[in-house]
Amino acid sequence: MKEDRVVFIFGPTAVGKSNILFHFPKNKAEIINVDSIQVYKEFNIASSKPSKNLMKHIKHHLVDFLDPEKDYTIGIFYEQALKIVKEIRQKKKIPIFVGGTAFYFKHLKDGFPSTPLVTSKIRIYVNNLLELKGKSYLLKELKNVDPIRFNMLNKNDIYRIKRSLEVYYQTGIPISQFQKKQNSEFKNIVIIGLKRSFEDLKTRISIRINEMLNSGLLSEIKGLFSKGYNENTPAFKGIGYNEFLLWKSRPCYGLNDIIGLINKNSFLYAKRQMTFFAKISDVLWLHPEDDLDNILNLIFKVDKEI
């Protein structure tokens, strides 16, 4: 058995990733979800979590397990994913990574940077610095402790600014001095990219948003607000949720404005996803419907070689 053999299936939002899985035989594979918002509990509709029927058909991992107030990082995902792959292999099944978070796929394929994990105490400390002293202070501090990293970063990339300082405060070593990446844990990967025309994606995104509204998205949003979730809640960074923060804070934004904004942001996100995915090598690009038989044959080929 080739323990490091895995399958990647990725593509932009609304391309039709989940539909393919219904065609996969039961008990042949398990899915490792690659989505930074679907991990959160309670944030169900706009995140387009896999349906109960799909999760009954094929077991899914890393879906609907995390408190919405907690951060979810690439480091946490990577560590969890490696553990789950081993568990799936022990069951003689195929581990299939499915999702749209391109950054996660990149590190699964190329290897994860060997920077250390950071304690919650350090994260809270850096967040407090940001809240009390502002981004300009963090930039000044980063320039002092790690000028190499400072010159590399987009000065509006607050996530990486915070991450750089967290690593320094945790270890006393600039993040720029750590090895940039290690070798991938996976040596044999079948990579399937799903594609559609942008016009087709645009139509499907619009249909999906209407389906979300019909499924009770507004009630879900109101329920989340009533529980105290707000702009500081990590789960609210997702498209389809973040836009409703405007609805709450600025009465001039009507529901139609918010829906239009979700449509716009979703399509722009799909374009960014495709741009990022295009940088990943060794991808076989296929249409989720026209090439369905080819997709299933590729996966069954892996099955036969195990």
Curated annotation (Swiss-Prot):
It catalyses: adenosine(37) in tRNA + dimethylallyl diphosphate = N(6)-dimethylallyladenosine(37) in tRNA + diphosphate. Pfam families: IPPT. Its cofactor is Mg(2+). Signal peptide: none annotated. Monomer. Belongs to the IPP transferase family. Catalyzes the transfer of a dimethylallyl group onto the adenine at position 37 in tRNAs that read codons beginning with uridine, leading to the formation of N6-(dimethylallyl)adenosine (i(6)A). This is tRNA dimethylallyltransferase. It comes from Borreliella burgdorferi (strain ZS7). The gene is miaA.
